Amino acid sequence: VKWWQGVSLWWVVGGGTLAQSLVVVYPPPRHTTTSDRIFVIGTAPLGGDVLVNGKPIGRSEFGHFAPSFPLQLGKNQLRVSYGNEVIDLTIERQKPALPPPYPAQTVIKPPGELVCFSIPAPPGAAVEVTNGNWRMELSPVSQRSLPPNSAVLTHRATQGETVSLYQGCTRQAISGKYIYKIRMQNQIQTMPAPGALILREKFPTIVVTTDQAITRSGPGTDFSRLTPLPKGTQAVVTGQEGTWLRLEYGAWIEQKDTKTIERATPPHSRIRGISSRNRGGQTEVLFPLEVPVPISIRQEERKLILTLHNVTAQTDTIFLVENPVIDRLDFQQTQPDRVEYTLTMKTKQQWGYTTRYENNTLVLAIRHPSTRPKVLLDPGHGSKNDLGARGPNGYPEKDVTLVVATLLAKELQNKGIDVVLTRSGDEDLFPHQRAEMINQIAPTIALSIHYNALPDDGDAENTEGIGAFWYHPQSHALAKFLHDRLTDKLNRKSYGVFWHNLALTRPTIAPAVLLELGFMIHPREFAWIVDPKSQQQLAKVLAESITEWLSKSSF
């Protein structure tokens, strides 16, 4: 994932001549940010000084630069000059957006459920929220804002600024539009909440209409992902915020991934005998149900734990077919409406799993280790619409990922490993299309090849190294092994190994890792990234590491 986009290129693809000798790739001439600093990425020929606001900046032996500068709130001017060439940059630093008054969108709840109203207001104010004759006074709360998730990538994941909020909770709210009144120094300001509150006694039952529908911990894409729901899953809705539905077991799902169905009773099921079968290089465990119910899956070392929601066990018999992956299957009714199944594995490494409903039977398919490994390589980005990060001279990430992935594919093929590339040219592929290719091809492992950049508050001049990103526990060992081997054998710095919710790390069908093989924006590391001999050496070491890991992990 790249956090910035640069200005139009001053270079010609394929190694053409620069139109001018001073190049600033980032930030664009006019840029808006909430960061308290900004880095400037660019290059100029050696033999002269590059100045920013009249002061010389450090450059690499290749002439590249990436200094950072503090930003004040409002407009900031940076003048980058080299000889007679001048590039002016205007960076506007804005305050982070304050949370809107609640409800920010239409909220539907059952009567008697706790409703918490809140609004930002200056300290010392008197604040109340009203709805016709209904009113409630709110109390001041001094609250620290959370840093963005991207702050982990710049090692600045500390709490943000203090926000002055006024809050109050009640179970006696009424339906309608709410208006906030803020009294400050004998002045009254009124502010309507953007959304409305609707109290509803009855809620519908929905069925999931898309394959592996996304569920989250809250009503929006800012909330964490939970286990996707297979197509056909049925559940009762218990609330709604905007276009997000809250399901009975606690997860939220977008309304567009569902449709309302008529049911006389809530979708609750019993479960009795459980069976299994070997089919197509995997062991399928079959859970016959009266109705397709929501599921949750948790993966641990040597364990895969499946939870069936809205289910009561009547199980007396379980048959586990002889197979190379699952050692034992146990279950426990952990709550009156929840059954937990623990699959204990024979080996430490798990090779992927999928879920689907066949009518009312949940099929949990556990993949066997491959007798002939197949590696999917995804060269990150592609096409003029998705350049990725760019080096100091404007060279795009999309081109170097394709070069390295192609070299790596040849090295792996020479070792007898089957390889599939998500792209072999300049195709324009969205991340979800690449992830779907992983699901369709079902490789032994999937590697997405990338090169790195930073958010605006990063230290571009001093951040370099190889990083690896994983999401499911089955991918952690691969990410750690490749990261450690590359940093050791190539004598490269470590950026780190990260758990990260990325499209190319989320597929469950195979261990999937996203590699960031260096920083495009780093003045010195960029030279290593684009050096043909270094690219060949990287491909060779990476192929050897993949082969070794596959050999060690298959038993």
Question: What is the meaning of each model-derived region?
Answer:
Residues 3, 20-29, 33-34, 47-49, ...:
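Short linear recognition/processing motifs and adjacent strand/loop elements at protein termini
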Residues 34, 109, 219, 223, ...:
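Soluble non-cytosolic domains of exported or imported proteins
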Residues 75-77, 88, 250, 402-409, ...:
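Extracytoplasmic/secreted envelope proteins and their assembly/folding machinery
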Residues 361-437, 441-445, 455-458, 462-464:
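Active-site histidine-acidic residue metal-binding/catalytic motifs
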Residues 381-384, 395, 425-429, 451-456, ...:
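Solvent-exposed loop/turn segments at secondary-structure junctions
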Residues 441, 445-448, 452-456, 467-470, ...:
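Active-site-adjacent mobile loop/cap segments within catalytic or ligand-binding domains
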